[in-house]
UniProtKB/Swiss-Prot annotation:
Coiled coil: none annotated. Transforms N(2)-succinylglutamate into succinate and glutamate. Keywords: Arginine metabolism, Hydrolase, Metal-binding, Zinc. It is an enzyme of class 3 (hydrolase). The lineage of its organism: Bacteria, Pseudomonadati, Pseudomonadota, Betaproteobacteria, Burkholderiales. Its EC number is 3.5.1.96. It catalyses: N-succinyl-L-glutamate + H2O = L-glutamate + succinate. The active site is at E229. This is Succinylglutamate desuccinylase.
């Protein structure tokens, strides 16, 4: 049996998981107990940490919470490190199996979005051809960790969750919004109610399979998965974490088996209808450099030109999300969405 003294000494680094990760350090032990021996933990590698109640059962939910897939999106990383601390001290009771993932430690240490390639476009095996990319082995490691974690999870609807937390490069009409991956199944009321609890203002529904971490866990691991965009990119230590309080509380409620007593309104919904794809470095994007996400444009408005390629708004109104002319040729330079709130809410499963 692990003594209290040994357990406390070996787990002291859990007070600042972020500091250990930024230092590229290794904990003195790779497994142990915390929270007065109520929780088992395992360090699975750089930025990867698994918790499990000592009395865990197969009926428990399995929850993956990730942040730092983009290394400069610091606020969710800081929140996740504090979540680890509070679980370790027993301040936050754990009522699920939990995998914590700091997505791109190399980019976090460099203070960059990524080192060679956007990690959140390398999942679903898209990392395989990129032999020289420093992100490619990390994508493979995250896929393997998620697959192993969910392999022993329950299979009931809602038994598997993945919350991938980000912040955005630009401002947004809706400061905090979520993206749901396309799986071929209708969105669930369970997820929408949780997003409402997190006070997420809008949800973007993808209509094609993608290459993000949440797409991978939804499609391959059968998780209820979402990507959260929680505000603006800021350096470590410069975040006003109070702005993320509702989302943080919702994550904490999820892992501790609690629910917000106040029934929140469901978020508005926007569905992807098209995208602007960068054909070449000659791409011209006819929107202001700092245009907020979800800015609306009227039918007929020319938004992009790239050689013979043109994109003009086809619907009565379309909103642009993630406009970025600086991506590599062949990648998405912007998404176009239309509002589908009423139809989506009516069809929730």
């Amino acid at each position: 049996m692990i003594s209290s003294a040994d357990s406390g000494r070996d787990a002291a680094w859990l007070d600042d998981f972020l500091a250990l990760t930024l230092a590229g350090g290794t904990p003195p032990a790779h497994a142990g107990e915390c929270a007065a021996h109520a929780v088992r933990w395992r360090w699975l590698g750089d930025g990867l940490l698994q918790f499990e109640p000592v009395d865990a059962t197969r009926r428990m939910q399995s929850v993956l919470v990730s942040a730092g897939v983009h290394g400069d999106e610091t606020a969710p990383i800081e929140l996740l490190s504090m979540l680890v601390r509070d679980i370790a001290h027993g301040a936050l009771p754990l009522r699920c199996r939990l995998l914590v993932a700091l997505g791109n430690p190399g980019a976090m240490r460099a203070g960059e979005r990524y080192l060679d390639d956007d990690l959140n476009r390398l999942f679903g095996g898209r990392h395989a051809p990129l032999a020289t990319s420093r992100e490619a082995p990390r994508a493979a490691q995250l896929e393997a960790a998620a697959s192993a974690f969910f392999a022993t999870a329950g299979r009931a609807r809602g038994a598997r969750w993945h919350i991938d937390m980000h912040t955005a490069i630009r401002a947004s009409v809706f400061e905090q919004f979520a993206l749901l991956p396309h799986t071929g199944e209708p969105p669930t009321r369970t997820m929408f109610e949780w997003l409402g609890e997190a006070r997420i203002a809008a949800v973007l529904l993808h209509t094609a399979k993608g290459s993000t971490f949440s797409h991978f866990t939804a499609q391959t691991c059968g998780a209820l998965a979402c990507t959260l965009e929680l505000g603006k990119v800021m350096p470590f230590g410069a975040n006003d974490l109070s702005r993320f309080a509702r989302a943080d509380a919702a994550v904490r409620n999820l892992v501790s088996g609690r629910r917000d007593a106040a029934r929140a309104a469901l978020p508005r919904v926007f569905t992807v209808v098209d995208q602007i794809t960068k054909q070449s470095d000659a791409l011209e994007l006819f929107v202001e450099k700092d245009v907020p996400n979800f800015t609306p444009f009227a039918q007929g408005t020319l938004l992009a030109r790239d050689g013979d390629y043109r994109y003009a708004v086809r619907h009565a109104q379309e909103r642009i999300v993630f406009p970025n002319p600086s991506v590599k040729p062949g990648l998405r330079a912007g998404l176009l969405v239309v509002e589908t709130t009423l139809d989506t809410h009516a069809a929730l499963a």
